[in-house]
A protein has these predicted regions:
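A short local loop/turn or secondary-structure capping micro-motif enriched for an aromatic residue
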Residues: 36-38, 109, 263
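N- or domain-start disorder-to-order transition segments that initiate the globular core
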Residues: 8-37
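His/Glu-based metal-binding/catalytic segments typifying zinc-dependent metallopeptidases
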Residues: 41-43, 226-283, 390
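Charge-rich, well-structured scaffold segments of protease-associated domains
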Residues: 5, 20, 31, 75-227, ...
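Short alpha-helix boundary/capping segments
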Residues: 50-57, 261-273, 277, 281, ...
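Active-/binding-site microenvironments in catalytic and ligand-binding cores
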Residues: 36-38, 92, 206, 234
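M16/MPP (pitrilysin/insulinase) zinc-metallopeptidase core fold and M16-derived inactive scaffolds
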Residues: 39-103, 279-295
Length: 434
């Protein structure tokens, strides 16, 4: 399959090329002349939503293990070869995918392709390395538990998705991680790490013919595949509240609301609403809670979208004695938006901010490669012109339409981390009467 998408905005950008190569890998790439760098990423449909029972955390564990060595490179070789050309290589695991990515000068694209394919398709998985890395990942789990802001967001995710696959923790638990064996890892990779589940994205200074040949040749891993399809994710249907007691100075507050999948008209309207409510320094939450009342240093909002669902988060970190008041202020701003909507000035400013953020991101090959890869995973690639058109197509009416659907306090989820036991009754009363 070969499809070209025009991409006229941006200096030196050529058409976006989408292909399914003979080896089964989906390739999505855009040459960007005038840049010295090239960014390449490998996206694999292997994340916590695909894990069952004792597999919890295995996608993330594999992300760690592949950097410990391959059939042809040791861990030190991987670092030394990339350092020698001034490049970088890294990875992350998300709910719905694992991503390995590299950035090098255009002249070193062959090295990037070779190294990314090596770690994704031919890791050595030495048993001694596996046992050692279990300790590293368990420490990462403890580190998350010691970071109250991250813990609040993670807790909100588990609360808002209940029994759905998206509630599963990316890191797993210490018990599941400690139990992983080499056979477990190989079995999971045989199911998920196959060309049909892989997308390779690339943007920057490269030649399409050379890239195509390199990806088709090197990404040759074979496995049995997997017929498992995660159950449909569903948000909670009623209010839900969870408090995590931590002996720390601040209380970290997350309020969660229904959102939308990524490729929907509603999601673009939510992006505009987010900027006005808490997504910028000029937003209502920032101005009210930080600037006017001085009750928080960090206060913001953001939407999260997945393939079949999404949610909207409001966050603030504040002193224990002010926690109830901050929740009250957050809910007051929500009520104001539900009653009167956002102003024409907020609407215009939010749309312009979205366009500006996107266009500035085009100046990075890494940002472009990431956008292409995520778009391919979601099944829809936007050219620059199309995306700007989608943003400009958001109307005041479309934002008004989603406000009661998103800011539905009857389906609000709450996650609170800190010294909450003393204040839980007060905070819970405000939360439950909203």
């Amino acid at each position: 399959m070969h499809r070209r998408c025009a991409g006229p905005i941006g200096i030196g950008q050529k058409v976006i090329v989408r292909e399914t190569l003979p080896n089964g890998v989906k390739l999505i790439a855009q040459e960007m002349t005038g840049f010295r760098s090239v960014s390449m990423a490998v996206w694999i449909q292997a994340g916590s939503v695909y894990e069952i029972g004792a597999e919890s955390g295995i996608s993330h564990f594999i992300e760690h293990m592949v950097f410990k060595g391959t059939e042809s490179r040791s861990a030190s070789d991987i670092a030394a070869e990339m350092d020698a050309v001034g490049g970088s290589i890294n990875a992350y695991t998300a709910k719905e995918c694992t991503c390995f990515y590299a950035k090098v000068l255009g002249e070193n694209i062959d090295l990037a392709a070779d190294m990314l394919s090596d770690i994704a398709c031919r890791p050595s998985l030495d048993p001694a390395d596996i046992e050692r890395e279990k300790g590293v990942v368990c420490e990462e789990i403890l580190m998350l538990e010691d970071d109250p802001e991250d813990l609040a967001h993670e807790t909100l995710s588990t609360v808002i998705y209940g029994d759905s696959p998206l509630a599963r923790p990316i890191l797993g638990t210490q018990d599941t991680v400690r139990a992983f064996t080499r056979d477990d890892i190989l079995s999971y990779m045989d199911k998920r790490y196959i060309p049909q589940n892989m997308v390779v994205s690339c943007a920057g200074n490269f030649k399409m013919e050379e890239l195509r040949a390199a990806v088709n040749k090197r990404f040759d891993r074979r496995g049995r595949g997997d017929s498992y399809v995660p159950q449909k994710n569903q948000l909670i249907k009623e209010k839900c509240f969870r408090a995590v007691e931590k002996d720390i100075e601040q209380v970290h507050i997350c309020l969660g609301f229904p959102g939308f999948p990524g490729d929907t008209e509603e999601q673009f309207a939510l992006l505009v609403l987010n900027n006005a409510l808490g997504g910028s320094m000029s937003s209502r939450l920032f101005q009210k809670i930080r600037e006017e009342h001085g009750m928080a240093y960090s206060v913001y909002s953001y939407p999260t979208s997945y393939s079949d669902t999404g949610y909207f988060t409001l966050y603030a970190g504040t002193g224990e004695k002010q926690a109830a008041k901050v929740v009250e202020l957050m809910l007051r701003e929500i009520d104001s938006v539900k009653k009167d909507g956002i102003t024409k000035e907020e609407f215009a400013r939010s749309k312009q901010q979205l366009k500006g953020n996107y266009l500035l991101g085009l100046e990075s090959t890494a940002s472009r490669s990431s956008s292409l890869g995520r778009g391919e995973l979601r099944g829809r690639i936007y050219t620059d012109e199309e995306l700007i058109r989608r943003i400009e197509g958001v109307t005041m009416e479309s934002v008004q339409d989603i406000i009661p659907r998103v800011l539905d306090t009857e389906r609000m989820a709450g996650a609170f981390v800190g010294r909450v036991n003393k204040r839980e009754t007060e905070v819970k009363r405000i939360f439950e009467t909203a």
